[in-house]
A protein has these predicted regions:
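N-terminal export signals
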Residues: 7-28
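Aromatic-residue-lined binding/catalytic grooves and analogous aromatic/hydrophobic interfacial grooves
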Residues: 115
Length: 368
């Protein structure tokens, strides 16, 4: 059954604006883009059996996925929910997160359930593309081993480098420009002031699903939905956190996500919080700050989602006797002088979603 979208929600539209020194980008304008069909709505689904004995458990995760997407949309069933966002002929990208492997990455079971949902909406496997920036990180995490037959994989470049100004895999027609460079670069050179969007997004897919994880981040404070987009879809991101004291994540992250091609093509966020990392992120610390949270989060609004995830991380830190993320100071596992989770609030001010807790509609489900 295909559900009339108008029966679920009054759709919002917003014109994407340039930020700071401007941007050049365009996307296929549509009402599905950020903040999406359900601004301010965040559905969390908990199941204590989703990770047991050190392993992800398929059946509980499948139940969580089905309940979460239905409750997010208000659709009568799993198939109708997916058809609200996707249809036959769409080419859909899935932005995974391999950073922090093997501790906290987008898990195979959630990824495969997303692909199953796309299939129900009429999207064939050949029209699904799973992506991360770096080929080597993608392969080291093992994503290629998890994909159903026919699903494609993609990346922008071979591996991480500290300069990130190469254009292979990036689109010269889509970029965010701001007056921010790495030390020693010519600040008058437009190329070093720009971050270009991956061709994966600009040329190869027409819709994007964001599959972030639940983690602390030394420079950004938290790495959730917004940062998975900003630092996974463009180049020249090292300038946003060049050193422990030269940190501009607070403004860089929302500036990138505000690019029309990102904002308009990103239609759904599924935050994998089955495992979380409450300190020492983004990389692993041999499981030192790892915990089983057993929860998936569903949203079309990355700001409301990240505000929720940030509060989850702060609650876990409080349980461990640690200060909130925004007040944290450098230590042996987190070296930045001042992390910048305020990127979430700034994104809200740009119209990328709902920041105010009083306006966030949190729907909390416990399946066992």
């Amino acid at each position: 059954m295909i559900v009339d979208r108008r029966s679920f929600v009054t759709l919002l539209t917003a014109a994407a604006s340039s930020l700071l020194y401007g941007c050049k980008s365009s996307g296929a304008a549509g009402k599905l883009g950020i903040p999406g069909l359900f601004p301010g709505r965040v559905v969390s689904v908990h199941h204590s059996g989703s990770h047991t004995g050190g392993e992800f458990q398929l059946e509980p995760i499948r139940s969580m996925m089905r309940r979460g997407i239905v409750d997010l949309t208000g659709a009568p069933d799993w198939i109708a929910a997916w058809r609200l966002f996707f249809e036959r002929g769409d080419v859909v990208g899935i932005k995974v997160n391999p950073v922090g492997s093997p501790d906290v990455i987008s898990c195979a079971e959630v990824l495969r359930e997303i692909i199953a949902g796309l299939n129900e909406a009429g999207v064939t496997n050949k029209d699904v593309v799973v992506y991360d920036r770096y080929r080597r990180q993608f392969l080291r995490a093992g994503f290629q081993n998890w994909l159903p037959d026919g699903v494609r994989q993609d990346w922008a470049v071979e591996d991480y480098d500290g300069i990130q100004l190469g254009m292979e895999g990036y689109d010269p027609e889509h970029y965010m420009e701001m007056a921010l460079t790495q030390p020693g670069q010519d600040a008058h050179d437009p190329h070093v002031r720009r971050s270009y969007v991956a061709q994966f997004l600009t040329r190869r897919v027409n819709k994007l699903i964001n599959l972030p994880v639940l983690k602390h981040h030394q420079s950004a404070g938290v790495t959730l939905a917004l940062k998975n987009l900003s630092h996974g879809l463009v180049n020249n991101v090292c300038r946003s956190h060049s050193s422990s004291t030269l940190n501009a994540c607070g403004i860089f992250i929302p500036a990138v996500v505000n690019l029309p091609v990102i904002r308009e093509k990103t239609v759904l966020h599924v935050l994998d919080g089955i495992l979380g990392m409450y300190h020492g992120g983004p990389g692993g610390r041999n499981g030192k700050y790892l915990w089983a949270h057993h929860t998936l989060y569903f949203a079309t609004d990355p700001v409301a989602l990240d505000k929720t995830g940030w509060q989850v991380l702060d609650a876990k830190r409080a349980e461990k006797g640690m200060t909130p993320v925004a007040l944290s100071r450098p230590d042996e596992d987190s070296h930045f002088l001042n992390c910048q989770p305020e990127h979430v609030e700034i994104a809200g001010a740009l119209g990328l979603g709902v920041w105010d807790d009083k306006k966030i509609d949190r729907r909390i489900l416990d399946l066992g």
